[in-house]
């Protein structure tokens, strides 16, 4: 068993504004906690290579991708939506974030008992096929999934999203695609206020109320996600790993702790060991309380071991 952490310096260079919660300090907090916990000596670390435009086209419309490239500013900021900005380094950061997922898929499919965690930003799961949303420019997890299907000939890829916000972009891209099983747990109502109605048979949404306690969250996952995942028999498990459901994170009102993120990693590891030779790729989504984020990522990685 080996865990590889994939990142890139360019992911630190994307800036969304001084008072924006999606900051480079998020990646620093993860690195600091890896050092503090001694995990830096256990995980293998490597730099991501950027995704190509052709890679991005798999998940997004050509028109949208071309528009993002054309809009990328040489200086200053532009707004893609009320929450999502681009500056001169944002396109490179987004390409390296998406590229990390592609690199991770290639890595874990080369040999069994491999897991990878992509410590990248900007996040991706709110980006729809043709729209930037919620801090997200390109949908990193969708790009990784389609790379696995089209370049590695996989037929069944599971995407598990435990960010406290619904992965509306991933659902938009994959609703009705029987090659994908998408499972998303999230607080509802809460931005983006979607997911309460199931759009397709390959979607398993778990809308849960504010102040959701860990025991309830775990019970719902055991009752709804795991039976679907077992029946699907995935050849690869991808994880949109958002840690903003932590009780210390003020972006929402869940009551989870780092122990819950270790638990979900253990559940996914058992599933992966049974169906896909332990192959798991996780990509960072949300998580904005810096200390809680670092602790939660380390706990999640320990759960994969």
Label the model's feature ranges:
Residues 1-160, 165-305:
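HDAC/HDAC-like amidohydrolase catalytic core signature
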């Amino acid at each position: 068993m080996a865990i590889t952490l994939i990142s890139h310096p360019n992911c630190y260079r994307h800036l969304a504004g001084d008072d924006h919660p999606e900051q480079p300090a998020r990646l620093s907090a993860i690195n600091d906690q890896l050092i503090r916990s001694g995990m830096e000596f256990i995980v293998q670390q490597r730099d991501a290579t950027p995704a190509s435009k052709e890679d991005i086209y798999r998940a997004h419309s050509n028109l949208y991708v071309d528009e993002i490239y054309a809009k990328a500013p040489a200086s200053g900021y532009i707004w893609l939506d009320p929450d999502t900005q681009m500056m001169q380094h944002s396109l490179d950061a987004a390409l390296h974030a998406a590229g990390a997922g592609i690199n991770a898929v290639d890595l874990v499919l080369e040999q069994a008992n491999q897991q990878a965690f992509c410590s990248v930003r900007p996040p991706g799961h709110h980006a729809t096929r043709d729209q930037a949303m919620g801090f997200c420019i390109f949908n990193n997890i969708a790009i990784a999934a389609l790379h696995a299907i089209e370049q590695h000939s996989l037929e069944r890829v599971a995407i598990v999203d435990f960010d406290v916000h619904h992965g509306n972009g991933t659902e938009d891209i994959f609703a009705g695609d029987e090659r994908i099983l998408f499972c998303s747990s999230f607080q509802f109502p809460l931005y983006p206020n979607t997911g309460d109605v199931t759009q397709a048979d390959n979607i398993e949404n778990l809308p849960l109320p504010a102040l959701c306690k860990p025991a309830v969250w775990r019970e719902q996952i055991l009752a709804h996600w795991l039976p679907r995942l077992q029946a699907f028999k995935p050849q690869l498990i991808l994880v949109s790993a958002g840690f903003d459901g932590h009780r210390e994170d003020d972006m929402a009102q869940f009551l989870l702790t780092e122990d819950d993120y270790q638990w979900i990693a253990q559940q996914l590891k058992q599933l992966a060991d049974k169906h896909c030779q332990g192959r798991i790729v996780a990509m960072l989504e949300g998580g904005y309380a810096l200390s809680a984020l670092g602790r939660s990522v380390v706990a999640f990685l320990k759960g994969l071991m």
